[in-house]
């Protein structure tokens, strides 16, 4: 039997534990030697590297749609802190360092989130859709991913987008961040906008790129193990030369593993762990 954490045994201690974690979380960033991106550019940089969009509303959660409306409200607050951000050479992007005070003037609403492996509602819930989008955008640039964690559980199918399997990025203030570092001599700029149906992510650069990046799944497997079904998705990145289309480089970035907690289509092949 797994031992319960102290905050699970005594839930009234949770707010104090969360406050403690956040203090240490942000203090750590003050003394980690990184130069964090914080400059907002008034003008858009000239070269568009990549653009993507994703449906805002997911109708497959099994929860009241009010939580989807609340999520969109939360995403709009967060987008205001990110739009136009410049990531200059040598700088590091931290999701939480930028979004930390997004609700300073207007409080977040309750949205869906996963806590202790279970889907629930929480103030500021739904923010992972923003971090997922940004991670997908960053993968299409030369920026170095230095901190990213995937969801260990998928409670419901993802909304329609051009993202492949295994490229999500969960975030939890005080615990889990999304960070990238600019090890190039170019400056990059991110924009996130929302219309009535979609959230749109863009990344621009101050110099003409010499190559583009394509992200694909090397393989996707579904395996029945430990009483559940797990998705194993290999994520590969190809660097393609502009003009010629020649593949300069292709490498496996990582293999993402997560538990699937919703019914898969009958056509999906599910292997047994001992095969």
Curated annotation (Swiss-Prot):
Species assigned in the record: Enterococcus faecalis (strain ATCC 700802 / V583)
Alphabetical list of InterPro entries matching this protein: Glycopeptide_resist_protein, Vancomycin_resist_VanW
Pfam families recorded: VanW
NCBIfam families hit by this protein: vanW-B (NF033122), vanW-gen (NF033128)
Induction (UniProt): By vancomycin, mediated by VanS/VanR.
Designated name of the protein: Vancomycin B-type resistance protein VanW
Superkingdom per UniProt: Bacteria
């Amino acid at each position: 039997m797994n031992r319960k954490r102290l905050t699970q045994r005594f839930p009234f201690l949770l707010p104090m534990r969360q406050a403690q974690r956040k203090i240490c979380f942000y203090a750590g960033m003050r003394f980690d030697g990184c130069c964090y991106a914080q400059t907002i550019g008034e003008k858009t940089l000239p070269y568009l590297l990549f653009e993507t969009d994703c449906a805002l509303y997911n109708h497959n959660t099994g929860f009241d749609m009010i939580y989807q409306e609340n999520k969109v409200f939360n995403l709009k607050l967060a987008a205001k802190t990110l739009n136009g951000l410049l990531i200059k050479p040598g700088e590091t992007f931290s999701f939480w360092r930028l979004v930390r005070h997004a609700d300073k003037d207007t409080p977040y609403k309750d949205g869906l989130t996963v806590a202790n492996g279970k889907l629930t509602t929480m103030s500021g819930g739904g923010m992972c859709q923003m971090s997922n989008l940004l991670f997908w955008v960053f993968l299409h640039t030369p920026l170095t991913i230095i901190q990213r964690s995937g969801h260990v559980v998928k409670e419901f199918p993802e909304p329609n987008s051009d993202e492949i399997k295994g490229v999500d990025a969960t975030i939890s203030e005080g615990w889990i961040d999304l960070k990238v570092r600019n090890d190039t001599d170019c400056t990059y700029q991110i924009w996130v906008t929302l219309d009535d149906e979609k959230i749109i992510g863009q990344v621009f650069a101050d110099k003409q790129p010499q190559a583009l990046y394509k992200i694909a799944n090397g393989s996707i497997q579904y395996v029945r193990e430990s009483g559940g079904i797990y998705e194993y998705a290999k994520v590969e990145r190809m660097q393609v030369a502009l003009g010629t289309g020649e593949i300069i480089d292709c490498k496996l970035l990582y293999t993402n593993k997560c538990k699937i907690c919703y019914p898969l289509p009958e056509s999906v092949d599910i292997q047994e762990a001992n095969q």
